[in-house]
Amino acid sequence: AYQPLGRNAPPEVKNTQWIRNGIDNFVLARLEAAGIDPSEEADRHTLIKRLFYDLIGLPPEPEQVDPFVDDRSPDAYEKLVNRLLASPRFGERWGRHWLDKARFADSDGYEKDNPRPDAWRWRDWVIDAVNRDMPFDEFTVRQLAGDLLPEAGPIDRLATAFHRQTLTNTEGGVDQEEFRVAAVKDRVDTTGAIWLGLTVGCAQCHSHKYDQITQREYYQLFAFFNNGDEATAEVPTSDEATARYEEAKKKHDAKSA
């Protein structure tokens, strides 16, 4: 698995008219090897539904379909793609994937599962980062150590709430140190999984059987996260964002009452 990445030249294909970019070469080469012809190009009604579901996770409104179907300009498809990429819904759709991997939730978990009223602030930071097309290296640094950046501001510290997405036990009488250590372990495991793509957690009890991670290395990483404190910081947000949250919360509470 630990092989350096190489740059492979796109394979040659017979049906060169079908090719629009280098990725198509790889797809078509496999299809031709299997004796399979590519599917016919989808009609406009199918295309707009696919684009909406893929890019923003929502179906198109009826009044959005006809203008695209009737638009016969050669760049109609590209214009629709750009419009959906510029939509705030794009960040909500694709930021959801990162939020899931980072174990985001609006409540603490465990038996009490108390609500986290300010959890949405980090969620919205992720969504905004996706919508602004933040470079992945910057996206990484700000979440892992945004508070250590030169002249770090409140938003930089907010990004590090990635580390606060662990389960929190607020039940009375529990051993807080036990659950603090469990939270640190969760940070190690999650960081290894989503940034390294490795099951780092296997090395908690023994050196990894398959990946090149020793038990000693696991606890070296554990020691790094064990130095952090779960400090509470006031993070200012715009009045507009706060108003949107309060309005959405009222609607949610009314429906679930």
Which residues are covered by each model-predicted region?
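Short, structured secondary-structure elements
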Residues: 1-246
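Long, charged, low-complexity terminal extensions
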Residues: 248-257
